[in-house]
């Protein structure tokens, strides 16, 4: 490349050398010339990393499916000879009481029962369940079961003609959890035991004699389901040594080191003589763990052995849709569901580690036999735990930090029981979860509003819609308000970590606000503003041992002392910058957060790495942080001296890091000067940050 500055220097240099030789002794001391040019700062770029595959199962607190009731009237037009089950039949449950999926239960409670007064049959109530495993029955975080009402035959008419006839019970099977696990055992095998329930499709003349009495036409006019199951052990006096419990039971083993799950779904048969078969296994489970979720397949184990053989039960087809999750602070319990590939059977289930005795000690063979010695035991005691996810919300007004629920999906924010997708629909339906920006480009941050489906219209809340489910219908309130969430999320180059700003807004119509009907514009009330961060932690075995690893990114911050400063994440030159150097070998992390259009670091962070996370402190410079640079006479400053920082590493190989802190000095800051000059304010800060691992530009 032709550089005029270089050419000019080449012309001048010979003349200069010649004059040096001619005048003053003819010597030229090269040692007096500084030939070392300043070295430019190294240039970096993001490392490439594996993008997460789009998740077929978006997770949730639980799922329910309603019994089918076929129109069996022979002259019906169109005829309804068969109703198959579908993935679209799954409905998400709300958060809260694990035995009460309120939306679904309210639907059935509102039905008029047989003879006008049939009560709700509920497996969670005493003496109404059919399944139980002794020592694994005291569920605290997950419940699975059924509830239904006996409904008399109903007829629909048009004019004087019958158009439809239906009969049989109406209800749901479900599993529902609370407190999705943030930590799980690092290694070892853990045994879970519990129960399962099912319902079937409906088809003309279909019957399953292995399941019980067929006189009311289960499987034909209404779904055969576990609530009417017969020929099973349903009390202790019927239980033999060869039985593994009452009714329908599950046995699941989880290998947390290998991230695998295997299990059996069993029916405990009532036996009349010693030659009878005590148990029948209908399914084997095989799944892979990802954070606090798992997915895989269920294989039918009692299929017809040849084309000529038939089975008198519906469990004859495999399923490729097994999914579920762990609940409880230490992964003590789990719930799952699947639909058979022939769309004939839907299954839900739950299982738990061994119950604790009432005195709180570990049951024999339970926690003490946990993964430390390789034997199957319970995850809740005596086994090392690892953090599998972070999900936190930091409120700006009171500087509080609270945990959010999350289903090991950084791209789904769960607040107030509502699931908010953080990526545009285009990226969710694609091959991976890369953040597709506007106009085909990539937006570093994304801003959008989210109104839960249950608030937009009177829909059946909790029903999965196009893979974008609302976790519950709790967003609206009884006063007709509609809650809208205003979200800004960062960053497009982060796949396993998302952080940003969240604003809750309540809207109500002018009529609801007491205005005249001519002022029909919605009135919006800002309820509260906060920051959030959530990420899928790196497996501790995959944490590298490298030294001087550079991470770069951005941050959101709100800093106050009388007056305040706020800054948002940005990839613009001179925007909010986050720079970190990580020494995995010595387990140290050092970094700076620099505010928009500032040269000096706003915060200096130092910390120690433990496992797949880190903790440390953040502080401003001794001279403080200028809150308002436009104030030339008296710049208000904030002094942060010892903010406690928490964070983690995210992605398959720790390609991403992030963290957070909220600081509120409850005493007057010694060196602080507030905007009013009275010296009575205290400094505070709320910060979330994220960064991507870097490599030198080649």
UniProtKB/Swiss-Prot annotation:
Residues 1-20 form the signal peptide. Residues 299-315 have a biased composition (Basic and acidic residues). InterPro entries: OMP/PagP_b-brl, TbpB_B_D, TbpB_C-lobe, TbpB_C-lobe_sf, TbpB_N-lobe, TbpB_N-lobe_sf. It is a lipid-anchor. Neisseria acquires iron by extracting it from serum transferrin (TF) in its human host. Acts as a TF receptor and is required for TF utilization. Involved in the initial capture of TF. Helps select only those TF molecules that can be used as an iron source and concentrates them on the cell surface, maintaining the iron-loaded status of the TF C-terminal lobe until its delivery to TbpA. Its main location: membrane. The lineage of its organism: Bacteria, Pseudomonadati, Pseudomonadota, Betaproteobacteria, Neisseriales. SUPFAM superfamilies: OMPA-like. Residues 369-383, 671-686 have a biased composition (Low complexity). It is found in: Cell outer membrane; Cell surface. A lipid is attached at residue 21 (S-diacylglycerol cysteine). Residues 46-56, 460-476 have a biased composition (Polar residues). The keyword Signal applies. It comes from the Bacteria. Belongs to the TbpB family. N.meningitidis cells will only bind to human TF, not bovine or porcine TF, explaining at least in part the bacteria's inability to cause infection in non-human hosts. Residues 33-58, 83-102, 294-324, 349-383, 428-479, 669-698 are annotated as: Disordered. GO terms for cellular component: cell outer membrane; cell surface. Keywords: Cell outer membrane, Lipoprotein, Membrane, Palmitate, Receptor, Signal, Virulence. Disulfide bonds: none annotated. This is Transferrin-binding protein B.
């Amino acid at each position: 490349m032709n550089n005029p500055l270089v050419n000019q220097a080449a012309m001048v240099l010979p003349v200069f050398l010649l004059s040096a030789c001619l005048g003053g002794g003819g010597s030229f001391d090269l040692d007096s010339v500084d030939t070392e040019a300043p070295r430019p700062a190294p240039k970096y770029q993001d490392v490439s990393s594996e993008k997460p595959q789009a998740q077929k199962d978006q997770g949730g607190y639980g799922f329910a499916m309603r019994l089918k009731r076929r129109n069996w009237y022979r002259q019906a037009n169109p005829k309804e000879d068969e109703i198959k089950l579908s993935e679209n039949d799954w409905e998400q449950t709300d958060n809260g009481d694990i035995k009460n999926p309120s939306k679904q239960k309210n639907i059935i409670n509102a039905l008029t029962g047989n003879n006008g007064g049939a009560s709700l049959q509920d497996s969670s109530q005493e003496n109404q369940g059919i399944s139980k495993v002794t020592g694994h029955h005291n569920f605290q975080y997950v419940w699975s079961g059924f509830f239904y009402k006996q409904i008399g035959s109903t007829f629909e008419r048009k004019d004087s003609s019958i158009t439809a006839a239906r009969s049989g019970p109406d209800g749901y099977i479900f599993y529902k959890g609370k407190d999705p696990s943030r930590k799980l055992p690092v290694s070892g095998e853990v045994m879970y035991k519990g129960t399962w329930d099912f319902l079937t499709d409906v088809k003309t003349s279909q019957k399953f004699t292995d399941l019980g009495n067929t006189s009311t036409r289960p499987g034909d006019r209404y779904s055969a389901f576990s609530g009417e199951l017969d020929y099973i052990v349903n009390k202790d006096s019927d239980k033999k040594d060869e039985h593994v419990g009452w009714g329908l039971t599950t046995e699941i083993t989880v290998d947390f080191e290998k991230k695998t799950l295997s299990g059996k779904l069993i029916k405990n048969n009532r036996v009349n003589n010693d030659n009878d078969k005590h148990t029948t296994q209908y399914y084997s489970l095989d799944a892979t763990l990802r954070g606090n979720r798992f997915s895989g397949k269920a294989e039918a184990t009692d299929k017809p052995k040849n084309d000529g053989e038939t089975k008198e039960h519906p469990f004859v087809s495999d399923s490729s849709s097994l999914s579920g999750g762990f609940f409880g602070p230490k992964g003590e319990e789990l719930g799952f569901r699947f639909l058979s590939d022939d769309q004939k059977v839907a299954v839900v289930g739950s299982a738990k580690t061994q119950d604790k005795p009432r005195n709180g000690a570990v049951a024999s063979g339970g926690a003490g036999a946990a993964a430390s010695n390789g034997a199957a035991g319970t995850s809740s005691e005596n086994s090392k735990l690892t953090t599998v996810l972070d999900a936190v919300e930091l409120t700006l007004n009171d500087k509080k930090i609270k945990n959010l629920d999350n289903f090991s999906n950084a791209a789904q924010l769960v607040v107030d029981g509502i699931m908010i997708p953080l990526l545009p629909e285009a990226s969710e339906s694609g091959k991976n979860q890369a953040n597709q920006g506007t106009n085909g480009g990539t937006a570093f941050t994304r801003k959008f509003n989210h109104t839960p489906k249950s608030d937009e219209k009177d829909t059946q809340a909790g029903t999965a819609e196009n893979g974008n489910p609302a976790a519950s219908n709790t967003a609206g309130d009884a006063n007709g308000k509609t809650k809208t969430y205003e979200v800004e999320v960062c960053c497009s180059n982060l796949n396993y970590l998302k952080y940003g700003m969240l604003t809750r807004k309540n809207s109500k119509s002018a009529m609801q606000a007491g205005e005249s009907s001519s002022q029909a514009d919605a009135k919006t009330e800002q309820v509260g503003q906060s920051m959030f961060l959530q990420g899928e932690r790196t497996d501790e075995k995959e944490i590298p041992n490298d030294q001087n690893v550079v991470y770069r990114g951005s941050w959101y911050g709100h800093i106050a002392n009388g007056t305040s400063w706020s800054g948002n994440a940005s990839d613009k030159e001179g925007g909010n910058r986050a720079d970190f150097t990580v020494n995995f070998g010595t387990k140290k992390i050092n970094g700076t957060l620099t505010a928009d259009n500032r040269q000096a670091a706003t915060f200096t962070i130092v910390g120690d790495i433990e496992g797949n996370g880190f903790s440390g402190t953040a502080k401003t410079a001794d001279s403080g942080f200028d809150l308002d640079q436009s104030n030339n006479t008296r710049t208000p400053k904030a002094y942060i001296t010892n903010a406690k920082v928490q964070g983690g590493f995210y992605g398959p190989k720790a390609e991403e890091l992030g963290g957070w802190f909220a600081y509120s000095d409850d005493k007057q800051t010694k060196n602080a000067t507030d905007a009013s000059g009275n010296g009575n304010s205290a400094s505070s800060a709320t910060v979330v940050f994220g960064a991507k691992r870097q490599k030198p530009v080649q």
